[in-house]
Amino acid sequence: MRKISVAAAVTLLASVGNAYAAGYQLNEFSVTNLGRSFAGIGVAGDDYSALGYNPAGMTLMKRSGMQAGLTMTEVASKIRGIGDQSGKKTDMDFMIPLPSMFGQYNVNDKLFLGAGIYVPFGLATRYGHDSFVAKDKNGVRRSELEVVDGNISAAYKVDNHLSLGVSGILRHIKGKLTSNVNSPLPNLGYSDFKVSGWSTTMNLGAMYEFDEDTRIGLSYRFKSTQRTTGHHTISVNPMYAALASRFGMGVDNRYDSVSDPELPASWILSGYHKFGEKWGTTATVKYTQWHRFHVFPAYSDNPLRPDLGVQYRWKDAWNFALGQDYYLNENWTLRAGLAWDQSPVPNSAYRTNRIPDTDRLWTSFGVSYATGNHQFDFGYAHLFMMHGKVWNSAEKDTNAKYKSYSNMYALQYQYKF
């Protein structure tokens, strides 16, 4: 099996404008938390998603229950050529669904069990086949990543102040990259690189309640490295069929592929304080260890050996969020939030068309309506993306400037047993 360095091939982790948390990490598996820009995740105590952030926070939910949510994310980007690509432009606007589901069973007032399915990582890049980005150099066409976590969790309330939690995670990753074949010959053909695989990881958490109105929580999600396998397909333009035959290839060619992507570890520190009967303030600091993201090695039996190697050299990144809840009455809760999300991309030389990531500012609001055993949650967020350039990048990508934004629309239903 011959080596091709396809950081991009399982970078797949790319999004035009990168509409989620910085890099390719996602937080969007709680609608109540989205309404406050994910401030207080794991310790807010108003839905069953804590096991996805800090499993110790499960002890805040006094009744067993379940919830299901869906976040629809609009990704919009204006891409303008710069340098040797000046005067060229393309636009992009598409929607991505992010579903989630959680359930919790309170064994007694000490032991809490839970399970969840959600998407902690994943992005998409979709350049039109006739865009100047798709026609140039590496010919980035389409990149997709979907990481689904199946989570089994347990939390234990040690006393009236301290709670501890642990989550075991079964993780499935699936990725796809479509691009032009990297060759000096024009329109040589297209390359599809598809991989999928399984891995395991875990999440540890602790929460300390100073009193019923004040608490903090700290959690750590371990990194995961998974062996992914699949196929690398090269479709050769029929006009080059004779040339392809000299390399023992036909018009359509399929090869085995392997890659070992690493998904980063992260720390979450969250706090909550209730002021009087009406106001609740939340805050979160999140630290993600992106420094290991240099190159994703990948392997293929492809005899043409297209070199898609990329040097990213990402840095660790911070996220800061502040949220406010207003408890209007026993049925209605209003909330809003603000967050700053730091990009792990160090500079324009390591920003690529596959991951044109930049810093972003979150603004959001949400509302919940509770009646009896039912609760309905709605959240909206708008992300202001800082402008970013791809310029003399490590991948020798197409020089371009990105102006992007994102809108998120989310609904969730909770049922308490």
Predicted segments with their positions:
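A generic secondary-structure signal marking the coil-to-beta-strand transition
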Residues: 17, 32, 49, 62-68
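Gram-negative bacterial Sec-dependent N-terminal signal peptides
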Residues: 1-20
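Short, solvent-exposed loop/turn elements at domain surfaces
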Residues: 75-79
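Outer-membrane beta-barrel porins/channels
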Residues: 20-37, 41, 81-87, 95-417
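Outer-membrane beta-barrel pore proteins
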Residues: 41-64, 103-107, 155
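Short strand-turn segments of transmembrane beta-barrel domains in outer membranes
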Residues: 38-41, 65-74
